[in-house]
């Protein structure tokens, strides 16, 4: 007999698995002579649901049960999952962390299920694992990021040689569509928040408007065209290693400057774009993301500015009048007020500066979640603690 999921359960289902018809056919609950896939989610009780093996119908069924973002999915069969396990540093039932608000157990199996559903390739698994691991760091405050009415999204950045191995887009259009790794890994992170953390829109995710960045917000740094050290090196990782940084950021905002030919002028355009009322940073200073285009970076570097100089300048000049900062509706800490102006960052370290994108004099900035979320960088390491030189290093024999 088929059992139905209570609609109120929504995204509280923890395990999602589609088995091949042959494996479920001999179960007593399977209708006579019916070939059907088995969706077997487990929360407080075991629930068996039989769905048509047709992929389109499976996608619709998953959507109706709030397992997806509204886009079609790849059915997560055991065969597909085992291909993902081969690229994991862990075993299928190992728990990486607990993801709030539901404190769902992020097992390797569950992460792989969401990776398959999102359309990831198996070799994307090491990056997906590290992104999910970073989200559980207390300073990231995933509970607050998921539950807030603010439209903060999970932005993930990859550094190191793995960006080439996964054929990630670090150049033209890196924040947009058209790249398999960028699109599907970012999507898989969001599906993990749906199905493991329980952060479904209107249930565990209470963003007033939401954000298109909550579909996928994932890219790599264009290290080859950057005049400065990449982010993971800045944070203490070897240049030849690879790393994933997770951040809580708003949707990116364009900075158009085709006329400035000095470092100061380019940076002034950037800080004036950042210095807006109504962002969280204006009343609770914290991190912000500056994705500088190679052409703007070349101009700034050509003026003799080191990366730390740029971060210092943005910290000192990204400010708003105190009366605008107070409009955020929270008590403004006066220690961030100087000469009747509020600093949007607490220190130069709050300025996350990377280089990405292609030709054109456009830079992108994104405000953060204020003091409520701090970015976390995780290196791609193997079980023995050594850095992975390639995703192939993860392959289990």
Predicted region positions:
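Non-transmembrane, aqueous-exposed alpha-helical and coiled segments at domain scale
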Residues: 2-397
């Amino acid at each position: 007999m088929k059992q139905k999921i209570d609609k109120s359960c929504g995204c509280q289902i923890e395990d999602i698995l589609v088995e091949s018809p042959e494996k479920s056919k001999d179960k007593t609950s399977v209708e006579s002579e019916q070939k059907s896939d088995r969706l077997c989610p487990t929360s407080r009780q075991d629930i068996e649901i039989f769905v048509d093996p047709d992929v389109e119908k499976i996608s619709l069924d998953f959507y109706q049960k709030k397992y997806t973002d509204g886009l079609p999915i790849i059915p997560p069969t055991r065969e597909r999952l085992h291909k993902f396990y081969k690229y994991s540093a862990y075993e299928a039932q190992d728990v990486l962390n607990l993801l709030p608000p539901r404190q769902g157990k992020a097992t390797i199996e569950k992460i792989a299920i969401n990776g398959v559903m999102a359309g990831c390739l198996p070799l994307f698994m090491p990056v997906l694992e590290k992104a999910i691991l970073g989200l559980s760091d207390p300073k990231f405050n995933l509970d607050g990021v998921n539950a807030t009415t603010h439209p903060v999204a999970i932005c993930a950045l990859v550094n190191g040689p793995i960006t080439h191995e996964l054929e990630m887009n670090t150049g033209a259009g890196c924040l947009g569509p058209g790249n398999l790794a960028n699109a599907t890994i970012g999507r898989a992170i969001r599906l993990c928040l749906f199905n493991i953390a329980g952060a479904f829109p209107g249930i565990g995710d209470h963003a007033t408007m939401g954000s298109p960045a909550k579909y996928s917000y994932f890219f790599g740094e264009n290290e080859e065209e950057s005049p400065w050290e990449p982010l993971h090196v800045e944070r203490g990782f070897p240049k030849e290693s690879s790393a994933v940084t997770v951040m809580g950021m708003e949707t990116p905002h364009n900075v158009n400057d085709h006329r400035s030919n000095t470092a100061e002028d380019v940076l002034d355009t950037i800080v004036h774009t950042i210095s807006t009322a109504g962002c969280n940073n204006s009343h609770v200073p914290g991190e912000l993301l500056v994705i500088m285009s190679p052409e703007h970076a070349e101009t700034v570097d050509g003026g003799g500015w080191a990366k730390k100089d740029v971060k210092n300048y943005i910290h000192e000049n990204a400010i708003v009048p105190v009366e605008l900062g107070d409009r955020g509706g929270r008590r403004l800490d006066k220690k961030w007020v100087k000469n009747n102006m509020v600093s949007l960052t607490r220190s130069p370290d709050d300025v996350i500066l990377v280089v990405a994108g292609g030709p054109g004099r456009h830079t992108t900035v994104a405000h953060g979640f204020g003091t409520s979320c701090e970015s976390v960088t995780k290196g791609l390491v193997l079980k023995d603690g050594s850095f992975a030189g390639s995703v192939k290093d993860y392959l289990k024999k």
